[in-house]
Amino acid sequence: MTFLSRSRFLALFLSGLTLLSVGTAVHAQAPAAPTDKPLKVGVSAGPYGDVLREAARLSEKQGIKAEIIEFTDWNQPNAALQAGDIDLNNFQNRPYLANQVKTRGYQIVALDESLLVPAGIYSRKYTRAADIPAGAKIAIPNDPTNGGRALLLFQKAGLIQLKPGTGLYASVLDVAENPKKLQIVEIDAAQLPRSLDDVAAAFVSSNYAYLAGLDLNTALVAETAVEEAKPYFTLVFAAREDRKDDPRIRKFIEVYRSQPVKDFTLAKFKGSILPAW
């Protein structure tokens, strides 16, 4: 290779390196997601998505297009949020989120409240809790948090008495008094509506009650906004810590927490699911 050829080769090689470094720098500075892409909002399958879709319909009129993505597994919405596959989710309460952050190391924070989703004790056989006979079966969720909620509500109904100080963390072992010797059966929460054919009464959360056609107004007893369990039936929006102040996220939540969406929620769910604002 002549001196001239070597010089031309070196010049071309250096030019290539320059272009490569420029291209890499441009790529590194590219935005993660263009603002013209829809805001992806995760939710558990069921009625909560109906409210989000109404908010999305209204937010599009204000320039914020949102895509509502439903998950059937409750572990997925936070995992997808942490991974950046969605921008926001709305399916959980603060205690559930706090536990997920603690156990899984998620960098996710709670934002504004969205819905109140009180549970009730339902029966297909009795119209009053007092009519439930001795030895009958009553059903509660088999997960610790909601199991405690259920036991508190059965205590409110006058059917059992819990040990002092157990509250939301109570288990079946914390039942201090059971004068009717009721059999307390622990069942997967999603199966509780179906259990009503086989038990005297069951604790059913609002999403499963709605899907099963149960009306909270017909419950033997229901949670109210002054209950100790309120944090457990108040849903919140959640976002990644580094995007909690994202203008599009804040705008969507503002639209969600508006009077038109409140009116929609009250009209559609007739008290079974309530706006939290």
Give residue spans per PLM region:
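Immediate post-signal peptide segment of exported/extracytoplasmic ligand-binding proteins
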Residues: 26-40, 59-60, 129-135
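Extracytoplasmic "Venus flytrap"
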Residues: 36-55, 72-76
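Short helix-initiation/N-cap motifs at beta->coil->alpha
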Residues: 68-79, 166-194
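Beta->alpha turn/N-cap motifs
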Residues: 70-74, 84, 89-98, 115, ...
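Ligand-binding "clamshell"
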Residues: 99-111, 126, 198, 203, ...
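A conserved helix-loop-strand patch within extracytoplasmic ligand-binding domains
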Residues: 111-161
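Periplasmic-binding protein-like
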Residues: 113-122, 148-155, 211-254, 256-277
